[in-house]
Amino acid sequence: MSVSAVELASLAAGPDAVRRLGARRGFLGETPANRELARILRDRPETFGSVHSLVLGADEVHVPDLAASRGFAPSLQVFGLECIDGFQRLRILSDALAGLGAEHLEKATVRLEIHCGRYRDVARSLHDAGHRLVNATTAQDGLIRCPNVRWLMAGDWEKEGFFDPRRGVSAGPHRRCFSMPEVTRGLACLSLAPGPEALHLATTDEGIERLWGAVGSELYLGVFRDRMSPLGVVRAVEAYDSARAALRNLPGRLKKGAGHLIDYAPDLICWKACRRLLPLEDLHVEAGSRHDWGGMIEDQLPAVTARTAEDLVRRYEAVHRARGDGPHYKGEAELLDVWREVLG
């Protein structure tokens, strides 16, 4: 049933509410989920009960004569109440009642389940193990809500190929497969954004999760731009891979001293090299492209990347010396501020 939030708000009042309701765990305080629930209740109370139900157990539930209610919503009499699932929500409602008042809570409804008898034991058992029955949601899952990503999913990937933000890409007659991190880093490397911030963020697993979680932001839209094409995605991944391979093939003598930039900040070099050679604005042009993308990526980009590495290593040597941080390069070369200084 749907119940007015104000009718439930007092259930979790008082310091003994956890014991009194037999809840599975006490109030967790200012967790990200609880803060978000409290924010929704404060800003959009009418949507508070749209996701998940409050699950209670009871010794007895007395249902009044509906005919005698004369058109008014009947009140249930519940005895021996137990909170099987949803104590965090109950506590948030209790706090909101004190802070926002009953009139505000009347705008919110909560979906309520009450289980009795043997069904109560079954419900308790399932909810106690609920964390094992739910697939955790990640930022990557949220990509499917992005219209630019959905545009790619509907594209022609040839020969039963596909684009799936969870599984990645299978494209072309040879069924070449790219993971979603590979796709993201390739698109970030060839983005139209004026700076390398997106690619710098995507260099780590934690950073790429943050980028995926920022759907709609300026940084995100610099990577997953409007009307991307399957061919453009393949080009981006191939260009990024080609530049990275060129850096790996450089002789070890170039990777000493300031040359550690090649090992510790390879994506900075790749980003700059791609801008020196490739027509980024035409990345997603498929039919009638004026450029030989295959030739540029396979034949020209490795040499451009090597020359770019030499240029940026010289610049980094000056930056490193000016910063006066001693002989340690690793932590320094990975900093976004250092990338910006090297780019000038």
Language model segments and positions:
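Short active-site loop/helix that positions an aromatic residue
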Residues: V78-L81, F87-H104
